Amino acid sequence: RANTYVDVGVDGIMIHSKKNTPDEIFEFSKIFRKNHKFIPLVSVPSTYNAVTEDELVKNGFNIVIYANQMLRAAYPAMHKVAESILKNGRSLEVDKDLIKIKKILELIPGTK
């Protein structure tokens, strides 16, 4: 299928795997790179998260997308804050765990 995409002018190929090792995507990249040396290959290592970016590059990948790690990290923190607010009826107890509003606003251009 990837060869067909390349034939019709695709700009790059993103491959994903539900397996917990990169073996499947490395096998694909080895075969794909024989015929397509310059088409960008994109990896999304959500399940095979022990693989390093260096290993991906050595196996022919050009782009790595960490598609959901930030969301998965944020959810437990948000859950903890919500539980504390419900328990205490206020947010004072979680202030120590929160970024200051001023710091958040500084992230937005033009709000300093």
Residue ranges and their predicted role:
Residues 85-112:
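Flexible C-terminal active-site loop/helix
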Residues 1-66, 72-84, 111:
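Alpha/beta enzyme core
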